Amino acid sequence: MKRAFIMVLDSFGIGATEDADRFGDVGADTMGHIAEACAKGEADNGRKGPLNLPNLTRLGLVKAHEGSTGKIAAGMDGNAEVIGAYAWAHELSSGKDTPSGHWEIAGVPVLFDWGYFSDHENSFPQELLDKLVKRANLPGYLGNCHSSGTVILDQLGEEHMKTGKPIFYTSADSVFQIACHEETFGLDKLYELCEIAREELTEGGYNIGRVIARPFIGDKAGNFQRTGNRHDLAVEPPAPTVLQKLVDEKNGHVVSVGKIADIYANCGITKKVKATGLDALFDATIKEMKEAGDETIVFTNFVDFDSSWGHRRDVAGYAAGLELFDRRLPELMELVGEDDILILTADHGCDPTWTGTDHTREHIPVLVYGPKVKPGSLGHRETFADIGQTIAKYFGTSDMEYGKAMF
C-alpha cells in the first residue's frame, strides 16, 4: 500500500537563498534566529531555554539547516543520529508567497510574475473599489492600505462595526484581503463579497494570487480576534500538479487538512477537512492517516507558524509552536507504514526577528521518513518541485515538467 503524508510547516525557512538580495532578505533565517533567541534566553515567554526539537533533529532538520547556512543552529545538537533523509531546497518561483511555494512543492513552479498592490496607502485602483461597492451594495469601505491583519482590526474594527463598511487591505504578497465582523457583517455576506472581489480581480486582469476572507469577533479594539473561518480564493495552478495527476491517472485520493484545498483552488483534492490550531490540525491529520487507503496523499498545512507567529514577529510563540509540533511528531511517525513516506517541509520563510511583517526568501527543509527511505543527505535541491517529482515517481504517475526525483 502506497501513501504519502505531506506536512507543511508554513513559513519555516532555514536560511536565506542565494537570490535573497532581490527580496531584501539577505541574512534572513527563520529557524536559526529563533534558535539563537532561545539560546540567549530571549524567548522564555511561555516556554524556556534552548530550542528543543529532538524528533525533528532526528529527521535531519539541524543538518538541513547546516547545509543551508553553513552553521549549526544555536543550542541544537549537530551530532544527533539521523534516521531520515534530508535536504534544503531553493525556490524556482518568482515570489515568496503561499501559492507559489505550495504549487512548486506539487511540481508546478510559478514562472510568471504575480500582480501586486505596491502602494502602502490608497493601495487599490479606484475603478476596482467602485465596482466592489456597486456590485456588493456596500456603504463604502475602510483601509485601502498595507497592514498587518491584527493591527488593522485595532485601528478600524470599531468603525467597521458601526458603519458596516468592510476593511480592505493588502501586503507585500499578491493578496486582496477583506476583514469583516462575523456577527455584525455576517460570514456568508463576507464570503459573497470575496467571491465578487475574486471575479473583479480576474476579469480586470490584475493577476492577484488570492482573495482572503478574514472574519473576526470581539466588541472593541484590543479584544478583536480573527476566527478559524478564514477562506482563501486562489486562482488555479497553471498546470496539473502531482495531486491532480494522482487523482486523474491513478484514481487516487488527496485529502486536504487545513487550508491546502484553498491554496490549490480545490484542484486535485478529493476530500477537505477543516481544522484550526496546531493541536486540531494534528488530530485531524492523525485521523485521516489512520483511515487512508492505497494511492492516497494526506496533505496538511500548519498555518499557525506563519499567521500567528511569523507575521506577528512573535519569536517565543513560534518557538513554542515548533516544540509542540515536535512533541506530537512521533504520533505521525508511528502511523507510517512499510511502503509509506512522510515528508515535512515548508513553503517560504517568515523570520520573526526580521524587519516588517512580510515573508522572507529562504531555503525550505525537506525531511523524508519511511521504513524504505535511506537516511542521509539529499543535498541542495534547486527547486521545491523535486518534492513533486519524487512523489510522482513514488506513485508511478507521468513525470512532472519540473524537478528531479530525490530518490
Curated annotation (Swiss-Prot):
Binds 2 manganese ions. GO terms for molecular function: magnesium ion binding; manganese ion binding; phosphopentomutase activity. InterPro entries: Alkaline_phosphatase_core_sf, DeoB, Metalloenzyme, Phosphopentomutase_DeoB_cap_sf. It comes from the Bacteria. Pathway: Carbohydrate degradation; 2-deoxy-D-ribose 1-phosphate degradation; D-glyceraldehyde 3-phosphate and acetaldehyde from 2-deoxy-alpha-D-ribose 1-phosphate: step 1/2. GO terms for biological process: 2-deoxyribose 1-phosphate catabolic process; 5-phosphoribose 1-diphosphate biosynthetic process; metabolic compound salvage; nucleotide metabolic process. Its EC number is 5.4.2.7. Mn(2+) 2 binds at residues 306, 311, 359. It is found in: Cytoplasm. SUPFAM superfamilies: Alkaline phosphatase-like, DeoB insert domain-like. It is an enzyme of class 5 (isomerase). Keywords: Cytoplasm, Isomerase, Manganese, Metal-binding. It catalyses: 2-deoxy-alpha-D-ribose 1-phosphate = 2-deoxy-D-ribose 5-phosphate; alpha-D-ribose 1-phosphate = D-ribose 5-phosphate. Its cofactor is Mn(2+). GO terms for cellular component: cytosol. The keyword Metal-binding applies. Mn(2+) 1 binds at residues 10, 347-348. Belongs to the phosphopentomutase family. Isomerase that catalyzes the conversion of deoxy-ribose 1-phosphate (dRib-1-P) and ribose 1-phosphate (Rib-1-P) to deoxy-ribose 5-phosphate (dRib-5-P) and ribose 5-phosphate (Rib-5-P), respectively. This is Phosphopentomutase. It comes from Klebsiella pneumoniae (strain 342). The lineage of its organism: Bacteria, Pseudomonadati, Pseudomonadota, Gammaproteobacteria, Enterobacterales.
